[in-house]
């Protein structure tokens, strides 16, 4: 590995190797990612299997990895105090958090320390506390990285990138695999600083591929469709908010709404509606930017252990550095997920663009389009599998709570009833419209509410209710609630 650079002043925070060095009027940020492509050769048996999976799949108690454990937890895990091969994105960032220059190169990493997010957050919150004293030799490094994070965050806010308030949860299981509790995920500055470092490295990767005019996969997130925009405008108007969105909105318009609604009791519901107006991000060789992050070009570089598109990006970057062209491996036989995702895109008017040109160039473009479709489809399949398992576990958990009463908030309104998320359990169930009393309720799609024709009683997103758990369908992954009449308010 004599051609590789060596980096020893670094530390490891659960998966990403980082080093922020203060320089005159800014920082030099190094993001080092395990060089999976060195071990997983194009077209090898491991590569074919990884391509077929396209992603790791995460369940509450188990992970189905994209790569064998000897790689993912061994040679490709950036463990402390051992040499590891990596790909480095080496960046110069000015005092305002703006990217000035970058370069990519293979390197050998020797990490000096591994931190958990909790440790880093504790040190940053109290640089003279017990955790900081125990890691005194690394405190300055963390402070520099935190200063850089704040500069990057400022640049992100000026760019107008979206940042919504939503509650993500995680299932904590006991030793028998049953749910012990469901708790909200807590994000602190340690999570955010690693996130910002990864975002800027991903942005550099996309720019590097574009500048080289080499085919590759981009992570594309398009703006809302006209139909969703109109629905969102009507919803905001119904709430009496003075803000709206234009026909060709910028991400900053959505972020302005998010900022203006901070502190409102229905802030999470408003932010949920903003998110629902968005399209899903996909992998495609046709770059059209990332709407949510407000990047003109974006891709995935930072997780080649668990995402095949990242592995492809590493290979493309290496090919560009070597002044070569990267040729895709044989695409696995398209399966059910591929066909399902193709139909979904076609229904939304986002079918993959037909290749233009002739001969090898057109064939290459078609191959990359097929790769993007395959990886996007398998990403959706993995997400759906994870949600299905979580739904089953939640149903199993709620069977032990039949007949019990809980408080909750309406999280979604449909023509057939209300979906309610329970306060303490973070479990969602349905109050069917027939459980709302003896009168007729009309669904108002604009206001996202059900309104009683006789009494005018309204149930909207954000309405607080008291419910009783009435039925659990384990096979159907459904939980039904019964409304405690007279115990709801907006």
Where are these regions (language model features)?
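Single conserved hydrophobic/aromatic residue that forms the stacking wall/gate
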Residues: 1-19, 488-489
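A structural connector/turn signal
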Residues: 8, 397, 454-456
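Electropositive polyanion-binding surfaces
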Residues: 16, 20-437, 462, 468, ...
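Short nucleic-acid-contacting surface segments enriched for D/E, G, S/T with interspersed K/R
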Residues: 401, 441-467
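C-terminal, low-ordered peptide segments at domain boundaries
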Residues: 484-486
